[in-house]
């Protein structure tokens, strides 16, 4: 491993657990500021963060035991200046359990400290704070506090889930302090063990020998992706029942679909590969005059990619990377309607239109990445829009006219979403357009005309009225209060991988049902206000996303600012392309009862 890089699998490993037996705080190693250029801000763990955490708990740590085999991770002076005694107790790890001598030294050290200062915590860390750390804490609980080894292992697992996850460590603990036959099976490896973009060519503590640690069976040299998460019971399109849709949960089919979508999108990481827009602010709005853009309305829909891979092989992929099989949805080949499309990947959103008071689900296609194996995502956006209309929508319409597609059997309708030149934004916001759309419109999307880019895309801008700006948080309801104060129930709001709350909100009786759920909140009168639960998401917004939204709240791009800026852009564009200045956005197509819907 590079001497300047973070340890393997460290980045998304939880920073710390909860106190064990009121005495020990297990944690991973901290990394000093010298690693900041290697570690994203939301993943950092400086010594100062430990100090702030202890202050928030109103507890004091008097001793920190460092079990790693290196001194490069942080400066011990940053610990000692907080009045915490630092002790280095090197412990190999990597397939070697702590020796009897090391265990005895740890126990004597902690026993001596606790006798002198029984009210102060002892911090313990190895590289990740699970196996070596858990082993020695459990040994102390058994030898000095008369715990059974079963109770000690269970208590550590509860305080630092999933606990000790190396089977040989568990067996050695039970061999020393119980019956090795009673040793529990090692728990499944935690998700962070499968982190992508981690170096694997050296020991976690920075020495040069080859790694002997997990996860060898799942983390091959060919792929450094995280293990894909499986969300059982995923909901397809909240609020309406859609026939013929079922979640794909069996392997290898699930993995094959996920990998195909990632490969088609040229996404070399795990998770959902779709392009993600960023919030418009007063800085990035200038990209609209520097680059070519198209605009469309922002529907309050649910994001899905669609993989078309043959007859009865149509799949939808949501932002949690959950996969749904869609029955009775046909996509014929334009040049021969008897042939079904395959190797085709679309991007779009499911919306719920209101037609005669009844909910009607529709899929709006707004981009295409692959068509019959061809990388159309590399083409400019105008050509991709043409491809959607000509190769996806029109062949379906032709086959409907021939009576060869039974619309009544399809689970939902499929349409292409139109995009316009940016000067049409005023019509989209102020004209009769919104009244002619049968679903909720909550802003605008500005799409660059360049090639498709997977993941977060700083070029795709979403604009919402300042009153609609929102953040998706993970809500954790807890009681807070110091000595002599009445405990109060508050909602702590978390983003990204941070284990410190980003903000907090007042908790009502109705909000208690959303504990540990993802909720969308807006900022009103200097407080975060609940909008809705996001059942389509399992993770909160990233820290950078939340900060961008906060910036847009503090320095909003109002409708007036936006339209005035676009007016100037349109004048520049019309001088370059006079013929385009006459284009106006048509209203969404209104179809008669006798016409065939797309």
UniProtKB/Swiss-Prot annotation:
InterPro entries: Dual-sp_phosphatase_cat-dom (IPR000340), mRNA_cap_enz_bifunc (IPR017074), mRNA_cap_enzyme_adenylation (IPR001339), mRNA_cap_enzyme_C (IPR013846), mRNA_Capping_Enz/RNA_Phosphat (IPR051029), NA-bd_OB-fold (IPR012340), Prot-tyrosine_phosphatase-like (IPR029021), Tyr_Pase_AS (IPR016130). One of its GO terms (cellular component) is nucleus. It is found in: Nucleus. Residues 25-183 form the Tyrosine-protein phosphatase domain. It catalyses: a 5'-end triphospho-ribonucleoside in mRNA + H2O = a 5'-end diphospho-ribonucleoside in mRNA + phosphate + H(+); a 5'-end diphospho-ribonucleoside in mRNA + GTP + H(+) = a 5'-end (5'-triphosphoguanosine)-ribonucleoside in mRNA + diphosphate. Residues 1-215 are annotated as: TPase. GTP binds at residues 303, 319, 347-349, 462-464, 532-537. Residues 186-227, 575-598 are annotated as: Disordered. Residues 233-598 are annotated as: GTase. One of its GO terms (biological process) is 7-methylguanosine mRNA capping. GO terms for molecular function: ATP binding; GTP binding; inorganic triphosphate phosphatase activity; mRNA 5'-triphosphate monophosphatase activity; mRNA guanylyltransferase activity; phosphoprotein phosphatase activity; polynucleotide 5'-phosphatase activity. Bifunctional mRNA-capping enzyme exhibiting RNA 5'-triphosphate monophosphatase activity in the N-terminal part and mRNA guanylyltransferase activity in the C-terminal part. Catalyzes the first two steps of cap formation: by removing the gamma-phosphate from the 5'-triphosphate end of nascent mRNA to yield a diphosphate end, and by transferring the GMP moiety of GTP to the 5'-diphosphate terminus of RNA via a covalent enzyme-GMP reaction intermediate. This is mRNA-capping enzyme.
């Amino acid at each position: 491993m590079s001497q300047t890089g973070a340890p393997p699998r460290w980045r998304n490993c939880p920073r710390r657990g909860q106190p064990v037996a009121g005495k020990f705080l297990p944690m991973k190693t901290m990394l000093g500021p010298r690693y900041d250029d290697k570690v994203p801000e939301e993943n950092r763990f400086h010594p100062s963060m430990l100090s702030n955490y202890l202050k928030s708990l109103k507890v004091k740590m008097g001793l920190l035991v460092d079990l790693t085999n290196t001194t490069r991770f942080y400066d011990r002076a940053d610990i000692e200046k907080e009045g915490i005694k630092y002790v280095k107790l090197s412990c190999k790890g990597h397939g070697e359990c702590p020796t009897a001598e090391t265990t005895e030294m740890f126990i004597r050290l902690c026993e001596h400290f606790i006798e002198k200062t029984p009210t102060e915590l002892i911090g313990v860390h190895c590289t990740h704070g699970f196996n070596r750390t858990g082993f020695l804490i459990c040994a102390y609980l058994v030898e000095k506090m008369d715990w059974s080894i079963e109770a000690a292992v269970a208590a550590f697992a509860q305080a630092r889930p999933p606990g000790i996850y190396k089977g040989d460590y568990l067996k050695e603990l039970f061999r020393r302090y119980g019956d090795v036959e009673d040793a529990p099976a090692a728990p499944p490896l935690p998700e962070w063990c499968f982190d992508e973009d981690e170096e694997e060519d050296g020991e976690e503590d920075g020495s040069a020998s080859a790694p002997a640690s997990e996860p060898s069976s799942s983390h091959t040299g060919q792929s450094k992706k995280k293990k894909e998460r499986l969300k059982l019971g995923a909901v397809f399109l909240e609020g309406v029942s859609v026939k013929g849709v079922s979640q794909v949960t069996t392997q290898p089919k699930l993995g094959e679909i996920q990998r195909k979508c990632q490969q088609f999108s040229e996404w070399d990481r795990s998770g959902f590969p779709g392009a993600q827009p960023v919030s418009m602010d007063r800085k990035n709005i200038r990209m609209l005059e520097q680059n070519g853009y198209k605009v469309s309305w922002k529907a309050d829909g649910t994001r899905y990619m669609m993989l078309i891979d043959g007859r009865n092989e149509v799949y939808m992929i949501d932002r949690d990377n959950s996969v749904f099989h869609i029955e009775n949805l046909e996509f014929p080949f334009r040049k021969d309607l008897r042939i079904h499309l395959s190797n085709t990947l679309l991007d779009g959103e499911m919306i719920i239109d209101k037609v005669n008071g009844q909910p009607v689900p529709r899929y709006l296609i707004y981009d295409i990445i692959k068509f019959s194996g061809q990388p159309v995502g590399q083409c400019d956006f105008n050509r991709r829009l043409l491809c959607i209309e000509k190769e996806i929508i029109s062949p379906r319409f032709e086959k409907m006219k021939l009576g060869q597609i039974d619309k009544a059997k399809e689970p939902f309708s499929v349409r292409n979403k139109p995009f316009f030149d940016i000067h049409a934004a005023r019509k989209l916001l102020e004209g009769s357009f919104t009244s002619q759309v049968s679903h909720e419109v909550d802003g605008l999307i500005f799409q660059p005309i360049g090639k498709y880019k997977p993941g977060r895309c700083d070029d795709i801008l979403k604009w919402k009225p300042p009153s609609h700006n929102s953040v998706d948080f993970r809500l954790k309801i807890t009681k807070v209060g110091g000595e002599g104060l009445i405990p109060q129930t508050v909602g702590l709001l978390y983003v990204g991988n941070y284990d410190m709350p980003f903000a907090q909100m007042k908790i009502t009786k109705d909000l208690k049902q959303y504990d540990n759920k993802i909720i969308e909140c807006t900022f009103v009168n200097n407080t975060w206000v609940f909008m809705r639960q996001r059942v389509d998401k399992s993770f909160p917004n990233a820290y950078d996303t939340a900060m961008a939204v906060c910036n847009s709240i503090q320095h909003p791009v109002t409708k007036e600012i936006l339209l005035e800026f676009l007016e100037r852009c349109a004048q520049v564009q019309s001088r370059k392309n006079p013929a385009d200045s006459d284009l106006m956005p048509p209203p969404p197509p209104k179809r008669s009862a006798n016409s065939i819907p797309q």
